[in-house]
């Protein structure tokens, strides 16, 4: 409970957040080097899982996962992931696609961005209360580690209806480095 004066707001803000691990958005087939459809990750990881390490190496970026898979040369990988808050481990053996690249058959992402509103400020802190941050592709509530808040220009407002929430659309200039970030989220 806050026992201090606050100033109500409602100002729009751009939000950028890094996921805690990499989010599995989908598990999908591809054609292997023999032209056959395959999906090494099928039945192992699924939409909404967070891959947090592979062969003992912590994963925080999509590029880290891609590099480990590429360097595997098709050897089985021990994948540690989180599903519904529970840590699990499985083995996945990457397969070579028609272009010679090793793949798992999992579409992943490591960040999310969007627009929100500042609820109130108290001089040094701000609060943005409301709904959780969810992935647009899966609807899964995001597990985030860090991020930032940025200025944004609203370009369109969609009115809400009884079965459809309203929506702000806008543009934010988001640089992961400091220059455009207003506040750090941690």
Over which residues does each language-model region extend?
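PDZ-domain C-terminal substructure recognizer with occasional recognition of PDZ-binding tails
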Residues: 2-3, 13, 66-106
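PDZ/PDZ-like groove recognition
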Residues: 14-45
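Extracytoplasmic/secreted envelope proteins and their assembly/folding machinery
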Residues: 21, 42, 62-69, 115
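Conserved PDZ fold ligand-binding element
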Residues: 41-63
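C-terminal, low-ordered peptide segments at domain boundaries
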Residues: 86-151
């Amino acid at each position: 409970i806050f026992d201090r004066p606050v100033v109500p707001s409602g100002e729009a803000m751009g939000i950028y957040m890094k996921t805690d691990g990499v989010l599995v958005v989908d598990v999908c087939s591809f054609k292997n080097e023999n032209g056959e459809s395959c999906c090494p990750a099928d039945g192992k990881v699924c939409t909404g899982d967070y891959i947090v390490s592979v062969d003992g190496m912590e994963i925080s970026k999509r590029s880290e996962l891609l590099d480990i898979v590429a360097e595997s040369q098709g050897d089985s990988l021990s994948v540690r992931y989180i599903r519904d808050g529970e840590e699990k481990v499985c083995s996945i053996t990457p397969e070579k696609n028609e272009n010679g690249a090793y793949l798992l058959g999992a579409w992943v992402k490591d960040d999310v961005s969007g627009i929100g509103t500042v609820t109130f400020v108290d001089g040094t802190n701000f609060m943005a209360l409301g709904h959780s941050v969810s992935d647009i592709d899966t609807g899964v509530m995001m597990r985030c580690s860090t991020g930032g808040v940025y200025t944004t220009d609203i370009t369109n407002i969609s009115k809400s209806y009884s079965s459809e929430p309203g929506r702000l659309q806008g543009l934010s200039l988001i640089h992961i480095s400091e220059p455009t970030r207003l506040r750090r989220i941690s």
